[in-house]
């Protein structure tokens, strides 16, 4: 006797690399179709300027290249006969998962920072105050040079998509994932317990680097302990999501959190 497969099995299971990449398609394409109309881009974005150069700074050629890259996202899955992963329901689930994680992350970071400030500083905003002061995890929307509320929100949404994709690519896939793999190999860490504690320590360091990233450069924020700690906790949450759920859920969570802060 055979039992029917659970239709949600593919949705809730951790995705493979190709599926993970394909599920970020709306984030990637949405950012690149929008950022071309803004005077700034995400600091981790190394693609937009290259695309503009290849397109000879022609708007229509740039848009065509962006859509072609988007098509390239899904082609490997289609060729592998895994087009089911591109069904609308899969993206809807990814968005819902991102919303849940973003809300939980904001609450967790708020509680953690409130506790930290109560221990090491005299500043006490209270939990509600910290929620209202929760910082963005991408470039400041004021940097986009918009002049009206609607324009600021649109720019904030676009920059949020870029932060979600590129900062997760740099900090979770690059610094945390690839960095840990290289260091484990370099130092010949083989025991399971050693690997675990190494990854925990490396995750904390990567989260601190991620947080510090937001204070660097002309458009960086002014440093303060509260926002640094808040972003560090968020970096740890993103790392947990990346480790146990994959790249796409981390991207969606990051983008949706920033949209919540910058555009809503």
Model-derived features: positions:
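Juxtamembrane helix-loop-helix connectors linking adjacent transmembrane helices
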Residues: 46-54, 79-164, 180-193
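Transmembrane helix-loop-helix hairpins at the membrane interface
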Residues: 153-264
């Amino acid at each position: 006797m055979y039992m029917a497969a659970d239709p949600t099995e593919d949705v809730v299971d951790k995705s493979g690399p190709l599926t993970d990449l394909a599920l970020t398609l709306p984030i990637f394409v949405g950012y690149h179709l929008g950022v071309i109309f803004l005077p700034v881009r995400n600091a981790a974005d190394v693609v937009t300027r290259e695309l503009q150069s290849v397109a000879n700074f022609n708007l229509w050629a740039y848009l065509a290249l962006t859509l072609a890259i988007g098509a390239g996202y899904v082609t490997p899955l289609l060729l592998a006969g895994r087009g089911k992963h591109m069904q609308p329901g899969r993206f809807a689930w990814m968005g819902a998962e991102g919303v849940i994680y973003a809300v939980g992350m904001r609450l967790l970071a708020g509680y953690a920072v409130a506790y930290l400030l109560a221990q090491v500083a005299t500043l006490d905003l209270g939990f509600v105050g910290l929620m209202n002061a929760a910082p963005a995890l991408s470039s400041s929307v004021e940097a986009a040079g918009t002049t009206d509320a609607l324009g600021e929100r649109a720019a904030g949404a676009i920059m949020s998509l870029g932060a979600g994709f590129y900062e997760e690519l740099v900090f979770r896939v690059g610094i945390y994932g690839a960095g840990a793999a290289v260091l484990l190999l370099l130092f010949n860490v083989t025991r399971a317990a050693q690997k675990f504690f190494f990854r925990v320590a490396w995750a904390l360091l990567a989260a601190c680097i991620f947080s510090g990233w937001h204070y660097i450069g002309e458009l960086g924020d002014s440093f303060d302990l509260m926002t640094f700690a808040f972003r560090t906790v968020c970096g740890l949450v993103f790392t947990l999501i990346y480790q146990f759920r994959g790249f796409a859920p981390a991207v969606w969570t990051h983008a949706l959190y920033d949209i919540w802060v910058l555009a809503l």
